[in-house]
């Protein structure tokens, strides 16, 4: 199964979504499952990959993402797989988890390289999909929405050059 990865440009936006997942999304899943007469998917809480959590919690979250799967044994021992992963730019590098196959990017990242790196975290082992939710009140997001196709057909030419670290040793 999959984990919904939600990418945010700021911790402020992530905090709002965390509250939304903990309250409204859980309630919606319960109501929908009852209406459809099916078992509901249990969401304990959203996991985070951000600078707000400690290194120990980050390691636990990554371990949970990589090792815990849905099974009767895990449910019986109250070990639940991660359903929702809220992340900031920390997810852009070094995260290679097979169960990350669905991503929602809330807003356009400031850098094209960040957009490419973050969106490429899904679909590493199995096919994945990334959705982008633009904010109509932000002119930058609106511009990317209006030029979505042309931007994606040639976005590698928009990648900004990175600066060299001063006093670093030659490669």
Each language-model region and where it sits:
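Conserved C-terminal RecA-like helicase domain
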Residues: 2-85
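A short beta-strand-to-loop transition that corresponds to the Sensor-1 phosphate-sensing loop
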Residues: 8-11, 87-90, 134-136
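Switch/connector loops and helix/strand junctions flanking conserved nucleotide-binding motifs
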Residues: 14-17, 56-58, 94-96, 112-114, ...
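Short secondary-structure boundary/capping segments
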Residues: 20-25, 65, 100-104, 119-122, ...
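Conserved segment of the helicase C-terminal RecA-like domain
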Residues: 81, 117, 121-159
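A short beta-strand element within the Helicase C-terminal
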Residues: 91-107, 128-132
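Conserved P-loop NTPase motor core
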Residues: 107-117
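Long, largely alpha-helical accessory region at the distal end of helicase-like NTP-driven motors
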Residues: 164-171
